[in-house]
């Protein structure tokens, strides 16, 4: 008799339906591209995840960088205890916190009785932004992922100024021609103005002859590859043979070049992607 009652209890419990949480974008309809003034999302019922009634609040961040080290750019919304029909937005992002492009993902941090659940979207494009990232950690993270916060155009030396974060990987001085920046990676940093009267700075070796350099050091090599476009691969070459010459950026067509992200190869670590159907909040 006791065994029969226990089986009945287990059978009844198996039919209890808990309303679980699922997040999706409302506008735009997909997570691929959105305007900076139109980001909305909603809670929906799901057959997996954490029961909706257990969630006390969720904070939505828009981030750049990587999932392992997210760099929050802004808090979009702090949700109270949600319901299956609750919706938030549209939200506007400050235009100046970063550049436009496929650089951003959403981080939803939900608090419930058992702890905290972190969920992340895939990268998506935010249109209409006009700012820049000052934090070099964001640059480094995006470069490691194959996603870069600047889409260079082949406009000569100004391209190099835009590609690399200020203050890293280069030493600048002004050449004899007023206003022209040069880079001198193989000698000490000179004064702000470099003229013929500057005699206290000596190059580490002969730098005016390309043949001398290649004899002892070999030809210049590629120092960095920047994935800045879905159709072109930009490669930066440093010309160490002359401190007064600029690096060269080569654009190579790369049909079908696709970005990489931190969880494409490690799906079990990332939790759900917001907007996936029939999935709820998963533990990260």
Swiss-Prot record:
Transmembrane segments: 88-108, 144-164, 212-232
Compartment(s): Membrane
Signal peptide range in chain numbering: 1-21
Membrane topology reported for the UniProt record: Multi-pass membrane protein
A GO BP annotation: fungal-type cell wall organization
Any one Gene Ontology cellular component term annotated for this protein: fungal-type cell wall
Main location: membrane
Pfam entry (one): Kre9_KNH
Chain segments annotated as coiled-coil in the UniProt record: none
UniProt superkingdom: Eukaryota
Keywords: Membrane, Signal, Transmembrane, Transmembrane helix
Name under which the protein is recorded: Uncharacterized protein C11C11.05
Species assigned in the record: Schizosaccharomyces pombe (strain 972 / ATCC 24843) (Fission yeast)
